[in-house]
Amino acid sequence: MAHRPRWTLSQVTELFEKPLLDLLFEAQQVHRQHFDPRQVQVSTLLSIKTGACPEDCKYCPQSSRYKTGLEAERLMEVEQVLESARKAKAAGSTRFCMGAAWKNPHERDMPYLEQMVQGVKAMGLEACMTLGTLSESQAQRLANAGLDYYNHNLDTSPEFYGNIITTRTYQERLDTLEKVRDAGIKVCSGGIVGLGETVKDRAGLLLQLANLPTPPESVPINMLVKVKGTPLADNDDVDAFDFIRTIAVARIMMPTSYVRLSAGREQMNEQTQAMCFMAGANSIFYGCKLLTTPNPEEDKDLQLFRKLGLNPQQTAVLAGDNEQQQRLEQALMTPDTDEYYNAAAL
C-alpha cells in the first residue's frame, strides 16, 4: 500500500485561508475524481434511546444535566425499530442509523442491539449505530451481527474539546474509533461547527480525522443546533460561508470519504445547501427529525434534489431484493404522501 502523507496544521490552515471560489473549485475537482457528483447517499437516523444521558456535552439536549424539556425514553423495542427502518427504506433511504443517548451501552442491552442490526440488514439496508464508548468485545459483537458503520464524533479539536465536554476524554473517543476499526466496522466520525471554536480549531478537528491510520469512511459535519436550556443556546450563528469552507476542506483532505451534511440543515436555505454539495458534500440525513432536533422534511429534500439534478445513491443490497431501485426512483418522482417516513411521529 502506498504511503499516505500526513497533513500538517499549517497545510490545513492554508486551505481555510484560500479565496472561497478557488477552494470550491479545488474541492469539486477532488470530489469528481472519486465520486459521481450527481449522487448523494441518503441515510435516516432514529433515536432508539432518548435523553437521560450522564454526559455533559454542552450542545446536547439529551444530557440529564440540562433542562431542555426533553422527556427521557427507554430503549425502544426491537420491532418498533425495525418498523421505522421499513418506513425509512420505503422513503428511499439506503442506510439506517440508530442512536442511543448513553455514555456506553450496557451488556444487558447488547442482545437487543444485535437483533436490531440483524433485522435492518435483512431488509437490504446498511446499518449504522452510535451508542457512545465501546469495549473491544462490544465492537466485535456488533461486527458479528453485521453492523456496517459506527458513528463516534470527535466534535472539535483536542485543544478546544475541554471547553465543551469534561465527562469523556478525547483519547477515549480515539480509542473507541480504533476498536471499531479493529473489529472490521467502517468508521463514521466528524464534528460540529458553531461551538465557539476558532478556524484553527476547525482545522485541528479535520487534521485529527484525516490523520487517523485510516480516515473515516463517513465524515458528518454538523452545524450547531442551538437548544434552549443547553449552555450553548446563545452562541453566535455560524456564517454560511464558514460552514461551506469547512465542507470543502474536509473534501480535499479526505477525498474518498463521504462528507455528510448532518445537524443544522433545517437552518440552511437551499442556496447554502447547494454550495455545500458543490463543495463536496455527498451524503445527507433524510427526514424531519435528527435524534431530537429538526431536519428538513423528505419532500423538501426531494424538491431540492430535483432542482439541482441530484439523485439518491444506491447501495449494495441483499440478493433477491429487487425493490430498492424502484423505491428510490419513486421517491424522487412522487409528491409527498402519508407513507413518507416521519421520525417526529415516533
From Swiss-Prot:
Impact upon substituting C97A? Total loss of activity
Q: State the protein's name.
A: Biotin synthase
Question: What does the record note on quaternary structure?
Answer: Homodimer.
Q: Name one GO molecular function term.
A: 4 iron, 4 sulfur cluster binding
Role, per record: Catalyzes the conversion of dethiobiotin (DTB) to biotin by the insertion of a sulfur atom into dethiobiotin via a radical-based mechanism.
Q: Which residues bind [2Fe-2S] cluster?
A: C97, C128, C188, R260
Q: What is its EC number?
A: 2.8.1.6
CDD domains named in the record: Radical_SAM (cd01335)
- One matching Pfam family is Radical_SAM
Name the top EC class: transferase
Q: How is its activity regulated?
A: Is physiologically inhibited by accumulation of the reaction product 5'-deoxyadenosine.
**Which pathway does the database say it acts in?**
Cofactor biosynthesis; biotin biosynthesis; biotin from 7,8-diaminononanoate: step 2/2
Domain Radical SAM core: from-to ranges: 38-256
Write out the residues that bind [4Fe-4S] cluster. C53, C57, C60
User: Which reactions is this enzyme annotated as catalysing?
Assistant: (4R,5S)-dethiobiotin + (sulfur carrier)-SH + 2 reduced [2Fe-2S]-[ferredoxin] + 2 S-adenosyl-L-methionine = (sulfur carrier)-H + biotin + 2 5'-deoxyadenosine + 2 L-methionine + 2 oxidized [2Fe-2S]-[ferredoxin]
> Which key words tag this protein in UniProt?
2Fe-2S, 4Fe-4S, Biotin biosynthesis, Iron, Iron-sulfur, Metal-binding, S-adenosyl-L-methionine, Transferase
* Cofactor(s) for this UniProt protein: [4Fe-4S] cluster; [2Fe-2S] cluster
Domain of life where this protein originates:
Bacteria
By its UniProt entry, which PANTHER family does this protein fall under?
Answer: BIOTIN SYNTHASE, BIOTIN SYNTHASE, MITOCHONDRIAL
Q: How changing C53A affects the protein?
A: Total loss of activity
Give GO terms for biological process: biotin biosynthetic process
Q: How is the cofactor bound?
A: Binds 1 [4Fe-4S] cluster. The cluster is coordinated with 3 cysteines and an exchangeable S-adenosyl-L-methionine.
Keyword Cytoplasm in the entry? The reply is no
Query: What family is reported?
Result: Belongs to the radical SAM superfamily. Biotin synthase family.
